[in-house]
Amino acid sequence: MGIKTNEAEKNEYFTALKPILNFLTDCIENPPPKSDVIFVFGSTKHYVAEYAAKLYLEKLAPYILISGHKSERCNNLYAKTEADFMKKEIIKLEIPDEKIITEYNASNTLENVIFGMRTLADKNIKINSAILVAKPFHLKRCLATFKKQFPQVKLSCSSKMTFTEYLSYELTENEKSKNNKTENEVIKRIIGEIDRLIIYAEKGDIVKQDIPENIIIAA
């Protein structure tokens, strides 16, 4: 999909984007069912941590698992890893430390799932069901990865934000931090999820997705 510049082209662009956004977020279930763990994919977004804490406080799961290695933003946030950052944010919301389990080595979605589940097993926490929490556009791939690696686990996906809210948040945060990312760059990152779903399915990392032809063409 080409990037548009003037307002008329921009409106046309966002209209064309809508099916892609709907496809990427159609797995979200709010509120999610009660599960054995809230499984959080590494991030440096405050709202992801806050939402995981909210689900815990609503008694939707007895544990929060956070998986995430170091990212570029960690240095700016005075955190060693994404998991470290998110744990600090969750503890601020008065979640008991012993209910937060961290995994610090995963550097991609596949590792998040494998290392996170291994960490839970090492602590003798049996997982039959999980609520997946991540940025909204990432959740479909998180779900597909989990289904491939642990097909026996019952899964649900949940997100604090709708896709529109997420996009607005990202652009506002970029302005506040004087980030050089443009609206187009944010959108390109999100649309790239379609390619990732195809590529990682071919590698055998995730469950193959039934992606409509119009979505592939639009992306």
Regions found by a protein language model. Give the residues of each.
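Nuclease catalytic cores that cleave nucleic-acid phosphodiester bonds
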Residues: 111
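Flexible loop residues that form catalytic
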Residues: 43, 69, 135
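Short, solvent-exposed loop/turn segments at secondary-structure boundaries
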Residues: 75-79
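Structural recognition of the beta-strand scaffold that forms the well-ordered cores
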Residues: 39-41, 65-66
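Short internal beta-strands
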Residues: 63-71
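Extended hydrophobic blocks
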Residues: 1-37, 47, 57, 73-74, ...
